[in-house]
Design a protein with these regions (language model features):
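A structural boundary/capping signal
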Residues: 1-149
Length: 149
């Protein structure tokens, strides 16, 4: 495992440990999302973890899928292991673009949609898969668990 990847393991584990401590201290008791962390909050948790990793200079992509009525979300490190698809520029009508921008949108609206093939070689970071009996913190490559989704 590369040094960079070991740092990601460290950061992800620190983040998960902190979230577990917050849960155990009952800070999340009245929180609709995190009250039973790490269960049933993989999407929101992945968004928070993405912000945290981003603050450490680690760009990520949000990935999610569904399998037999269950959904799951995780991150993929956006580095040289991920294929960057060609952006599809979407032309928005001026009125909609102005409305979008007024709510904090970006001036240039690009829709980049990654496919499974684009991210299949990427490094997965997942701190909520233990709700499915997987590892406490998973930093690694696609396996049978992630292929299901």
């Amino acid at each position: 495992m590369k040094y960079y990847d070991r740092k990601i393991v460290q950061y992800a584990t620190e983040f998960k440990d902190t979230m577990m401590n917050l849960r155990d201290s009952e800070l999340f008791v009245k929180d609709d999302v995190f009250f039973q962390f790490s269960n049933a909050c993989c999407g929101d948790t992945s968004c928070l973890l993405a912000e945290y990793l981003g603050s450490k200079g680690i760009p990520t992509l949000y990935v999610w899928g569904d399998y037999e009525g269950q959904t799951h979300a995780w991150l993929v490190v956006n580095d040289e292991r991920v294929f960057l698809p060609t952006p599809q520029n979407i032309v928005l009508p001026k009125e909609i673009k102005n409305l979008y921008d007024s709510y904090g949108g970006i001036s240039k609206f690009n829709n980049v949609r990654y496919t499974e093939e684009d991210v299949c070689e990427g490094l997965i970071v997942d701190i909520t898969a233990d709700q499915f009996g997987e590892e406490y913190v998973y930093v690694g490559y696609i396996n049978d668990f992630y292929r299901r989704f």
